[in-house]
């Protein structure tokens, strides 16, 4: 955004005056929601030296979208625990607004930016009560809707960070990815990919391998160019989890049934070490265990960087079992 085009505090207050309902608010506030967020715009929203605290000035007299724009800007700029604690009470008041659901559906970008700002500041400022805020947003958006919203991923991230795995599992099991609305609830496909990746991680943690694979397979199968980071991260785990569960991985045609040759080639390049590991893993020949160990040692930094070393080690521990099962299948073919 060019400097001369930056909005001012006066223009924000004027926009707030024009916001009489959800429709007029969403139209008037668009200039104050750049993607990605911009500090200069946040400063304009909050007023000189953040003294305006504009959210408190009109939270009762305007649609909730107006103060939520303020809260998103304020949370992004938090610098102290005291400031974080002071946000909670007025924010909760706005989140209890009777028309909040209809308002949130008018500005999905605002919802996404607010949710991600809360999740990103959560570890720095426990007084922000991030999980409570995100749960409240999630419940409002999930009213009579079972698909993924743009609050799902930040909520799961915070629940995992605070070791609330049972609650995270409930969110995942209560969500039907096939019912996702990519207009009102989830306009950014990246939010969907992030949810699929995190849901897969949660299912993996509780030992629900089939559900984890379903999440990650879905992420990998989306035809995006280029492949996104969460897709590559999901594929790496698909390969390892299939090795852990089955002892091998299917062909590329089976693994990527909806992707063209270019997309498959990109995935193979991005996840080359994992495909090599799978190839050696499935070769039950003399010396292959040592070769596998050497591969893991040589690629240890990559596995650690991908946070998959734990899963790799589990695969190595399960390999003798898969080798025995493979021999049993061979013996059954003898006359």
Give residue spans per PLM region:
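TPR-repeat structural position
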Residues: 84, 124-127, 165, 209
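TPR repeat positional signature
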Residues: 111, 115-118, 134, 152, ...
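Residue signature of alpha-solenoid helical repeat architecture, marking inter-repeat boundaries
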Residues: 105, 109, 145-146, 190, ...
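Eukaryote-biased activation of long, low-complexity terminal tails and linkers
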Residues: 2-125
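Amphipathic alpha-helical segments of tetratricopeptide repeats
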Residues: 92-100, 135-142, 172-184, 217-224
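Alpha-helical scaffold segments of alpha-solenoid architecture
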Residues: 192-199, 204-335
């Amino acid at each position: 955004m060019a400097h001369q085009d930056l909005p001012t505090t006066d223009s924000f207050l004027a926009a707030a005056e024009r916001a009489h309902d959800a429709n007029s608010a969403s139209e008037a506030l668009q200039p104050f929601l750049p993607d990605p967020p911009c500090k200069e715009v946040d400063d304009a929203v909050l007023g000189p030296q953040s003294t305006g605290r504009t959210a408190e000035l009109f939270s009762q007299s305007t649609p909730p979208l107006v103060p939520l724009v303020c809260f998103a800007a304020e949370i992004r700029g938090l610098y102290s625990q005291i400031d974080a604690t002071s946000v909670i009470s007025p924010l909760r008041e706005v989140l209890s607004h009777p028309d909040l659901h209809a308002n949130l559906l008018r500005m999905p970008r605002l919802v996404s930016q607010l949710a991600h700002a809360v999740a990103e500041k959560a570890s720095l400022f426990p007084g922000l009560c991030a999980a409570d805020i995100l749960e409240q947003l999630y419940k409002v958006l999930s009213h009579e809707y079972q698909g993924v919203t743009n609050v799902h991923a930040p909520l799961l991230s915070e629940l995992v960070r605070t070791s609330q795995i049972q609650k995270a599992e409930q969110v995942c099991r209560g969500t039907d990815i096939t019912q996702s609305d990519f207009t009102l609830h989830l306009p950014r496909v990246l939010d969907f990919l992030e949810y699929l990746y995190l849901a897969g991680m949660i299912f993996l943690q509780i030992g629900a391998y089939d559900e984890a694979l379903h999440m990650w397979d879905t992420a990998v199968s989306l035809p995006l160019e280029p492949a996104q980071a969460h897709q590559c991260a999901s594929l790496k785990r698909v390969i390892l989890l299939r090795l852990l569960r089955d002892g091998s991985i299917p062909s590329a045609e089976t693994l990527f049934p909806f992707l063209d040759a270019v997309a498959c080639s990109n995935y193979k390049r991005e996840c080359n070490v994992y495909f090599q590991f799978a190839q050696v893993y499935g070769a039950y020949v003399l010396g292959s265990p040592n070769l596998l160990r050497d591969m893991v040692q040589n690629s240890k930094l990559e596995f650690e960087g991908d946070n998959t070393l734990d899963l790799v080690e589990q695969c190595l521990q399960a390999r003798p079992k898969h080798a025995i099962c493979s021999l049993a299948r061979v013996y059954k073919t003898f006359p």
